[in-house]
């Protein structure tokens, strides 16, 4: 029994840290002898909730995710091995759900965007030339619950047809009795005889054809009288396109007499509004004026100040050459004078030595005496 006046405690403060340490050691030993969470896959998912660790020999099972189906015999489970790793397993046994095959439409073609009917794929439709698409040109393989289905019905390819082309005033077109025209069917327009002295001119395309979107290739032409005034150029003459009357697209050329120049175009055309385009030119007296824009406006031409700069460059080069020549001449003259001075100094120094030698010697006459 405890001494009187002292209460017993189930755990003393000194024993609690030791018990906590023992628990941690036990937990660490358990973790070190276990596998971590099992691997994850794109096409498979774990059956049940994952745990932070698994004991050696413990098994986990997988199933194919939504949109995938299982094809045996590949395993869909794994076991925690003694080396604390999971036995190899893969999701290669799970295949994407596939949409049903769709045939090419009549007079068209169905093209798989990625070459597969798996969900997530696209199926594109095109029609042959002369046919147009009715419906959606792209279908998507989607999941409906667990089944892969297409996003809509396949389209159809129908033949391109055109309604009869427009009728025109003072004219007609071929095949006027036909009520429906197929793709690339063509008609040709022509004008009726005119009641007056001047004929009708066909303004626009004479032949049109049934094209895409069930429309004609061009607007219907127009039949009307187009007549331009007789072109007169004073001090000039007509050199081509002669005639008494000038109708649609008539072309005339001019030249001026000697001593005159042409102001305008030498070639004019009679257009649909019965006027000449360009306007009839004029012949003006005198030589043709020359209009030379500033040379700075044309790339490749020197700027106005470039000539001055070039002449300045020539003067600078000439000045440099002159300075060099003068400097060389001065150096040569100075060197020449220096060498001449040395030569004269040498002669002056040699004279006294020769005289001294002569004075030291006894002249022959004195020796004989």
Swiss-Prot record:
Transmembrane segments: 315-335
CDD domains, A to Z: CCP
Compositional bias annotation for Polar residues: 356-369
All residue ranges annotated as the Sushi domain in the record: 35-96, 97-159, 160-225, 226-285
Membrane topology: Single-pass type I membrane protein
Summary of the function given for this chain in its UniProt record: Acts as a cofactor for complement factor I, a serine protease which protects autologous cells against complement-mediated injury by cleaving C3b and C4b deposited on host tissue. May be involved in the fusion of the spermatozoa with the oocyte during fertilization. Also acts as a costimulatory factor for T-cells which induces the differentiation of CD4+ into T-regulatory 1 cells. T-regulatory 1 cells suppress immune responses by secreting interleukin-10, and therefore are thought to prevent autoimmunity.
Record-given protein name: Membrane cofactor protein
Source organism per UniProt: Chlorocebus aethiops (Green monkey)
High-level lineage: Eukaryota, Metazoa, Chordata, Craniata, Vertebrata
